[in-house]
Protein backbone atom coordinates (compact mmCIF):
# COMPACT_ATOMS: atom_id res chain seq x y z
CA UNK A 1 0.00 0.00 0.00
CA UNK A 2 1.42 3.43 -0.95
CA UNK A 3 1.74 6.11 1.70
CA UNK A 4 -1.40 8.31 1.91
CA UNK A 5 0.70 11.44 1.53
CA UNK A 6 1.85 10.18 -1.87
CA UNK A 7 -1.51 8.89 -3.11
CA UNK A 8 -4.22 11.26 -1.77
CA UNK A 9 -4.93 13.95 -4.43
CA UNK A 10 -4.84 16.88 -1.97
CA UNK A 11 -2.17 15.67 0.46
CA UNK A 12 0.01 14.75 -2.53
CA UNK A 13 0.17 18.44 -3.56
CA UNK A 14 1.28 19.44 -0.04
CA UNK A 15 3.79 16.57 -0.02
CA UNK A 16 5.33 17.59 -3.33
CA UNK A 17 5.54 21.24 -2.24
CA UNK A 18 6.73 21.04 1.39
CA UNK A 19 7.84 17.51 2.29
CA UNK A 20 9.43 15.47 -0.52
CA UNK A 21 10.39 18.54 -2.56
CA UNK A 22 13.94 18.08 -3.93
CA UNK A 23 15.89 21.12 -2.71
CA UNK A 24 19.50 22.19 -3.36
CA UNK A 25 21.68 21.14 -0.41
CA UNK A 26 23.56 24.46 -0.25
CA UNK A 27 20.84 27.15 -0.04
CA UNK A 28 21.60 29.70 2.67
CA UNK A 29 19.45 31.61 5.16
CA UNK A 30 18.62 34.07 2.35
CA UNK A 31 16.23 31.39 1.07
CA UNK A 32 14.23 31.54 4.33
CA UNK A 33 12.34 34.68 3.39
CA UNK A 34 9.85 32.97 1.06
CA UNK A 35 8.41 30.92 3.91
CA UNK A 36 8.58 33.94 6.24
CA UNK A 37 6.49 35.92 3.73
CA UNK A 38 3.93 33.10 3.74
CA UNK A 39 3.76 33.26 7.55
CA UNK A 40 3.49 37.09 7.44
CA UNK A 41 0.58 36.80 5.01
CA UNK A 42 -1.27 34.29 7.21
CA UNK A 43 -0.61 36.44 10.29
CA UNK A 44 -1.89 39.58 8.52
CA UNK A 45 -5.05 37.81 7.28
CA UNK A 46 -5.83 36.44 10.77
CA UNK A 47 -5.17 39.67 12.71
CA UNK A 48 -6.95 41.65 9.97
CA UNK A 49 -9.99 39.39 10.20
CA UNK A 50 -10.32 40.05 13.94
CA UNK A 51 -9.82 43.80 13.43
CA UNK A 52 -12.51 43.82 10.72
CA UNK A 53 -14.99 42.41 13.28
CA UNK A 54 -14.80 45.68 15.22
CA UNK A 55 -13.77 48.26 12.62
CA UNK A 56 -16.34 50.53 10.95
CA UNK A 57 -15.52 52.02 7.55
CA UNK A 58 -17.37 55.28 8.02
CA UNK A 59 -15.61 58.66 8.18
CA UNK A 60 -17.49 59.65 11.35
CA UNK A 61 -16.68 56.46 13.30
CA UNK A 62 -13.51 54.91 11.75
CA UNK A 63 -11.04 56.70 14.05
CA UNK A 64 -13.20 56.00 17.12
CA UNK A 65 -13.57 52.32 16.18
CA UNK A 66 -9.77 51.88 16.08
CA UNK A 67 -9.52 53.61 19.48
CA UNK A 68 -12.30 51.32 20.74
CA UNK A 69 -10.36 48.24 19.52
CA UNK A 70 -7.26 49.39 21.43
CA UNK A 71 -9.05 50.37 24.64
CA UNK A 72 -12.13 48.21 25.07
CA UNK A 73 -11.76 45.00 23.04
CA UNK A 74 -10.06 42.10 24.84
CA UNK A 75 -6.45 42.02 23.60
CA UNK A 76 -7.52 44.42 20.84
CA UNK A 77 -4.35 46.50 21.31
CA UNK A 78 -2.06 43.54 20.62
CA UNK A 79 -4.06 42.48 17.54
CA UNK A 80 -3.97 46.03 16.18
CA UNK A 81 -0.23 46.48 16.78
CA UNK A 82 0.60 43.00 15.46
CA UNK A 83 -1.27 43.93 12.28
CA UNK A 84 0.43 47.34 11.94
CA UNK A 85 3.95 46.10 12.73
CA UNK A 86 3.32 42.81 10.91
CA UNK A 87 3.11 44.94 7.75
CA UNK A 88 6.59 46.30 8.53
CA UNK A 89 7.96 42.77 8.99
CA UNK A 90 6.21 41.78 5.74
CA UNK A 91 8.06 44.53 3.85
CA UNK A 92 11.42 43.78 5.52
CA UNK A 93 11.06 40.16 4.36
CA UNK A 94 9.90 41.33 0.90
CA UNK A 95 12.90 43.60 0.41
CA UNK A 96 15.28 40.85 1.59
CA UNK A 97 13.57 38.34 -0.72
CA UNK A 98 13.78 40.63 -3.78
CA UNK A 99 17.38 41.57 -2.88
CA UNK A 100 18.27 37.88 -2.72
CA UNK A 101 16.70 37.40 -6.16
CA UNK A 102 18.76 40.28 -7.58
CA UNK A 103 22.02 39.11 -5.96
CA UNK A 104 21.81 35.46 -6.93
CA UNK A 105 20.26 35.95 -10.38
CA UNK A 106 16.93 34.30 -9.52
CA UNK A 107 15.29 36.62 -12.08
CA UNK A 108 16.26 34.12 -14.79
CA UNK A 109 13.18 32.14 -13.70
CA UNK A 110 11.04 34.53 -15.75
CA UNK A 111 7.52 33.38 -14.77
CA UNK A 112 8.35 33.16 -11.05
CA UNK A 113 10.06 36.58 -11.16
CA UNK A 114 7.20 38.33 -12.98
CA UNK A 115 4.56 36.91 -10.63
CA UNK A 116 6.82 38.06 -7.79
CA UNK A 117 6.76 41.63 -9.17
CA UNK A 118 2.97 41.41 -9.42
CA UNK A 119 2.89 40.22 -5.80
CA UNK A 120 5.12 43.13 -4.71
CA UNK A 121 2.81 45.66 -6.41
CA UNK A 122 -0.32 44.05 -4.92
CA UNK A 123 1.17 44.01 -1.41
CA UNK A 124 2.17 47.68 -1.78
CA UNK A 125 -1.38 48.58 -2.89
CA UNK A 126 -2.85 46.63 0.04
CA UNK A 127 -0.53 48.30 2.57
CA UNK A 128 -1.32 51.75 1.18
CA UNK A 129 -5.08 51.19 1.49
CA UNK A 130 -4.66 49.73 4.98
CA UNK A 131 -2.82 52.88 6.08
CA UNK A 132 -5.87 54.97 5.10
CA UNK A 133 -8.32 52.96 7.25
CA UNK A 134 -7.59 54.38 10.77
CA UNK A 135 -8.63 57.78 9.33
CA UNK A 136 -5.99 59.81 11.15
CA UNK A 137 -4.39 62.94 9.69
CA UNK A 138 -1.64 61.04 7.85
CA UNK A 139 -4.18 58.47 6.59
CA UNK A 140 -6.35 61.18 5.04
CA UNK A 141 -3.57 63.34 3.61
CA UNK A 142 -1.54 60.33 2.45
CA UNK A 143 -4.61 59.08 0.55
CA UNK A 144 -5.22 62.55 -0.91
CA UNK A 145 -1.63 63.08 -2.06
CA UNK A 146 -0.96 59.59 -3.46
CA UNK A 147 -4.30 59.19 -5.30
CA UNK A 148 -3.88 62.73 -6.66
CA UNK A 149 -0.73 61.59 -8.48
CA UNK A 150 -2.97 59.82 -10.98
CA UNK A 151 -4.21 63.23 -12.13
CA UNK A 152 -0.81 63.59 -13.85
CA UNK A 153 -1.95 61.03 -16.45
CA UNK A 154 -2.78 63.05 -19.58
CA UNK A 155 -6.42 63.40 -20.71
CA UNK A 156 -8.05 60.86 -18.33
CA UNK A 157 -6.16 61.78 -15.12
CA UNK A 158 -8.74 64.01 -13.40
CA UNK A 159 -11.66 61.70 -14.23
CA UNK A 160 -9.66 58.72 -12.99
CA UNK A 161 -8.91 60.37 -9.63
CA UNK A 162 -12.58 61.33 -9.08
CA UNK A 163 -13.61 57.81 -10.07
CA UNK A 164 -11.25 56.32 -7.46
CA UNK A 165 -12.39 58.82 -4.82
CA UNK A 166 -16.07 58.24 -5.58
CA UNK A 167 -16.59 62.02 -5.37
CA UNK A 168 -14.69 65.29 -5.56
CA UNK A 169 -12.46 64.61 -2.54
CA UNK A 170 -11.29 61.77 -0.30
CA UNK A 171 -14.44 61.08 1.73
CA UNK A 172 -16.82 58.37 2.99
CA UNK A 173 -17.04 56.62 -0.41
CA UNK A 174 -13.23 56.46 -0.62
CA UNK A 175 -12.85 54.99 2.87
CA UNK A 176 -15.56 52.37 2.27
CA UNK A 177 -14.08 51.17 -1.02
CA UNK A 178 -10.53 51.15 0.39
CA UNK A 179 -11.75 48.92 3.22
CA UNK A 180 -13.42 46.58 0.70
CA UNK A 181 -10.24 46.37 -1.40
CA UNK A 182 -8.02 46.03 1.67
CA UNK A 183 -10.12 43.06 2.76
CA UNK A 184 -10.17 41.24 -0.61
CA UNK A 185 -6.59 41.84 -1.81
CA UNK A 186 -4.81 39.56 0.73
CA UNK A 187 -6.82 36.62 -0.64
CA UNK A 188 -5.77 37.57 -4.18
CA UNK A 189 -2.18 37.75 -2.86
CA UNK A 190 -2.60 34.20 -1.45
CA UNK A 191 -3.72 32.94 -4.87
CA UNK A 192 -0.80 34.72 -6.58
CA UNK A 193 1.61 33.25 -4.01
CA UNK A 194 0.32 29.75 -4.86
CA UNK A 195 0.98 30.44 -8.57
CA UNK A 196 4.42 31.87 -7.64
CA UNK A 197 5.22 28.55 -5.90
CA UNK A 198 3.76 26.53 -8.78
CA UNK A 199 6.14 28.17 -11.27
CA UNK A 200 9.07 27.90 -8.83
CA UNK A 201 8.52 24.16 -8.46
CA UNK A 202 8.54 23.76 -12.25
CA UNK A 203 12.23 24.75 -12.29
CA UNK A 204 13.33 24.03 -8.72
CA UNK A 205 15.12 26.51 -6.46
CA UNK A 206 18.18 28.49 -7.43
CA UNK A 207 21.22 28.22 -5.12
CA UNK A 208 24.07 30.55 -4.03
CA UNK A 209 26.58 29.20 -6.56
CA UNK A 210 24.19 29.70 -9.49
CA UNK A 211 25.25 26.30 -10.86
CA UNK A 212 22.68 23.56 -11.56
CA UNK A 213 22.08 21.54 -8.39
CA UNK A 214 20.33 18.57 -10.03
CA UNK A 215 23.14 16.26 -8.92
CA UNK A 216 22.92 17.30 -5.27
CA UNK A 217 19.38 17.60 -3.90
CA UNK A 218 17.93 16.78 -0.48
CA UNK A 219 14.28 16.49 0.68
CA UNK A 220 12.72 19.72 1.98
CA UNK A 221 11.54 17.99 5.16
CA UNK A 222 13.14 17.71 7.75
CA UNK A 223 16.17 19.78 6.67
CA UNK A 224 14.58 23.00 5.49
CA UNK A 225 11.42 22.79 7.61
CA UNK A 226 13.66 22.99 10.70
CA UNK A 227 15.75 25.75 9.12
CA UNK A 228 12.59 27.72 8.24
CA UNK A 229 11.20 27.30 11.76
CA UNK A 230 14.41 28.83 13.17
CA UNK A 231 13.97 31.83 10.84
CA UNK A 232 10.31 32.03 11.82
CA UNK A 233 11.14 32.11 15.55
CA UNK A 234 13.70 34.89 15.02
CA UNK A 235 11.17 36.91 13.00
CA UNK A 236 8.37 36.40 15.54
CA UNK A 237 10.73 37.40 18.35
CA UNK A 238 11.62 40.63 16.49
CA UNK A 239 7.94 41.31 15.75
CA UNK A 240 6.82 40.76 19.33
CA UNK A 241 9.65 42.92 20.70
CA UNK A 242 8.45 45.68 18.39
CA UNK A 243 4.77 45.16 19.32
CA UNK A 244 5.29 44.88 23.08
CA UNK A 245 8.09 47.40 23.68
CA UNK A 246 7.74 50.13 21.03
CA UNK A 247 4.57 49.57 18.98
CA UNK A 248 4.54 53.14 17.62
CA UNK A 249 8.23 53.26 16.65
CA UNK A 250 7.53 52.95 12.91
CA UNK A 251 4.22 54.85 12.88
CA UNK A 252 3.54 58.57 12.52
CA UNK A 253 2.36 60.61 15.54
CA UNK A 254 0.08 62.61 13.19
CA UNK A 255 -2.07 59.52 12.77
CA UNK A 256 -3.24 59.86 16.38
CA UNK A 257 -5.02 63.06 15.34
CA UNK A 258 -8.41 62.44 13.65
CA UNK A 259 -8.51 63.32 9.93
CA UNK A 260 -9.23 66.98 9.28
CA UNK A 261 -9.58 68.14 5.65
CA UNK A 262 -9.10 71.78 6.75
CA UNK A 263 -5.72 71.27 8.42
CA UNK A 264 -2.72 69.99 6.43
CA UNK A 265 0.12 68.33 8.42
CA UNK A 266 3.50 70.10 7.94
CA UNK A 267 5.20 67.00 6.49
CA UNK A 268 3.05 64.50 4.61
CA UNK A 269 4.89 61.21 4.27
CA UNK A 270 3.91 57.55 3.79
CA UNK A 271 4.94 54.58 5.94
CA UNK A 272 8.72 53.89 6.07
CA UNK A 273 8.57 51.08 3.50
CA UNK A 274 7.39 53.48 0.76
CA UNK A 275 9.85 56.28 1.55
CA UNK A 276 12.45 55.20 -1.05
CA UNK A 277 9.85 55.45 -3.84
CA UNK A 278 8.45 58.67 -2.34
CA UNK A 279 11.95 60.22 -2.36
CA UNK A 280 12.34 59.32 -6.06
CA UNK A 281 8.91 60.86 -6.77
CA UNK A 282 9.81 64.09 -4.95
CA UNK A 283 13.24 64.43 -6.56
CA UNK A 284 11.71 65.24 -9.97
CA UNK A 285 10.21 68.75 -10.16
CA UNK A 286 7.68 67.74 -12.86
CA UNK A 287 4.48 65.98 -11.71
CA UNK A 288 4.15 63.49 -14.60
CA UNK A 289 7.92 62.88 -14.58
CA UNK A 290 7.80 62.15 -10.85
CA UNK A 291 4.92 59.70 -11.26
CA UNK A 292 6.75 57.91 -14.10
CA UNK A 293 9.94 57.68 -11.99
CA UNK A 294 7.87 56.33 -9.08
CA UNK A 295 6.36 53.57 -11.25
CA UNK A 296 9.70 52.81 -12.92
CA UNK A 297 11.48 52.51 -9.56
CA UNK A 298 9.51 49.28 -9.03
CA UNK A 299 8.86 48.20 -12.64
CA UNK A 300 12.61 48.36 -13.38
CA UNK A 301 12.73 44.92 -11.72
CA UNK A 302 10.82 43.52 -14.72
CA UNK A 303 13.73 44.24 -17.06
CA UNK A 304 16.38 42.78 -14.69
CA UNK A 305 16.61 39.57 -16.83
CA UNK A 306 17.25 41.68 -19.96
CA UNK A 307 20.07 43.61 -18.25
CA UNK A 308 21.95 40.45 -17.24
CA UNK A 309 25.18 40.42 -19.26
CA UNK A 310 27.39 38.21 -17.09
CA UNK A 311 28.28 34.62 -18.03
CA UNK A 312 27.64 33.70 -14.40
CA UNK A 313 24.20 33.62 -12.90
CA UNK A 314 24.69 34.96 -9.38
CA UNK A 315 27.13 37.44 -7.86
CA UNK A 316 28.84 34.90 -5.59
CA UNK A 317 32.03 34.90 -7.71
CA UNK A 318 31.73 38.48 -9.08
CA UNK A 319 33.39 40.94 -6.66
CA UNK A 320 32.83 44.03 -8.86
CA UNK A 321 29.09 43.37 -9.13
CA UNK A 322 28.98 42.65 -5.39
CA UNK A 323 30.37 46.15 -4.66
CA UNK A 324 27.75 47.59 -6.99
CA UNK A 325 24.93 45.61 -5.35
CA UNK A 326 25.83 46.85 -1.87
CA UNK A 327 26.16 50.39 -3.24
CA UNK A 328 22.57 49.98 -4.48
CA UNK A 329 21.47 48.83 -1.00
CA UNK A 330 23.20 51.86 0.58
CA UNK A 331 21.53 54.09 -2.03
CA UNK A 332 18.08 52.68 -1.20
CA UNK A 333 18.71 53.29 2.52
CA UNK A 334 19.73 56.87 1.67
CA UNK A 335 16.52 57.33 -0.36
CA UNK A 336 14.48 55.94 2.56
CA UNK A 337 16.09 58.49 4.89
CA UNK A 338 15.55 61.36 2.41
CA UNK A 339 11.88 60.41 1.91
CA UNK A 340 11.24 61.13 5.59
CA UNK A 341 12.99 64.52 5.55
CA UNK A 342 11.38 67.92 4.79
CA UNK A 343 11.76 69.35 1.27
CA UNK A 344 14.60 71.81 1.90
CA UNK A 345 18.15 72.58 0.81
CA UNK A 346 20.55 69.68 1.46
CA UNK A 347 17.86 66.97 1.27
CA UNK A 348 16.56 67.93 -2.19
CA UNK A 349 20.03 67.64 -3.75
CA UNK A 350 20.86 64.40 -1.91
CA UNK A 351 17.52 62.92 -3.02
CA UNK A 352 18.13 63.85 -6.66
CA UNK A 353 21.66 62.40 -6.62
CA UNK A 354 20.46 59.20 -4.91
CA UNK A 355 17.64 58.86 -7.48
CA UNK A 356 20.04 59.28 -10.42
CA UNK A 357 22.42 56.76 -8.82
CA UNK A 358 19.57 54.25 -8.30
CA UNK A 359 18.62 54.16 -11.98
CA UNK A 360 22.26 54.41 -13.14
CA UNK A 361 23.33 51.37 -11.11
CA UNK A 362 20.52 49.15 -12.40
CA UNK A 363 20.31 50.35 -16.01
CA UNK A 364 23.94 51.17 -16.84
CA UNK A 365 26.54 50.07 -14.29
CA UNK A 366 25.32 46.51 -13.60
CA UNK A 367 25.27 45.45 -17.30
CA UNK A 368 28.64 47.19 -17.89
CA UNK A 369 30.26 45.54 -14.86
CA UNK A 370 28.89 42.16 -15.99
CA UNK A 371 30.59 42.60 -19.37
CA UNK A 372 33.86 43.75 -17.73
CA UNK A 373 33.87 40.65 -15.49
CA UNK A 374 33.35 38.42 -18.54
CA UNK A 375 36.43 40.00 -20.15
CA UNK A 376 38.49 39.67 -16.96
CA UNK A 377 37.69 35.94 -16.81
CA UNK A 378 39.18 35.45 -20.28
CA UNK A 379 42.67 36.45 -19.08
Curated annotation (Swiss-Prot):
Component of the ubiquinol-cytochrome c reductase complex (complex III or cytochrome b-c1 complex) that is part of the mitochondrial respiratory chain. The b-c1 complex mediates electron transfer from ubiquinol to cytochrome c. Contributes to the generation of a proton gradient across the mitochondrial membrane that is then used for ATP synthesis. Keywords: Electron transport, Heme, Iron, Membrane, Metal-binding, Mitochondrion, Mitochondrion inner membrane, Respiratory chain, Transmembrane, Transmembrane helix, Transport, Ubiquinone. It is found in: Mitochondrion inner membrane. GO terms for molecular function: metal ion binding; ubiquinol-cytochrome-c reductase activity. A ubiquinone binds at residue 201. Heme 1 (or BL or b562) is low-potential and absorbs at about 562 nm, and heme 2 (or BH or b566) is high-potential and absorbs at about 566 nm. Belongs to the cytochrome b family. Heme b b566 binds at residues 97, 196. Pfam families: Cytochrom_B_C, Cytochrome_B. Binds 2 heme b groups non-covalently. The chain crosses the membrane at residues 33-53, 77-98, 113-133, 178-198, 226-246, 288-308, 320-340, 347-367. Its cofactor is heme b. The gene is MT-CYB. Gene3D superfamilies: Cytochrome Bc1 Complex, Chain C. The keyword ATP-binding does not apply. This is Cytochrome b. InterPro entries: Cyt_b/b6_C, Cyt_b/b6_C_sf, Cyt_b/b6_N, Cytb/b6-like_sf, Cytochrome_b, Cytochrome_b_C_euk/bac, Cytochrome_b_N_euk/bac, Di-haem_cyt_TM. It is a multi-pass membrane protein.
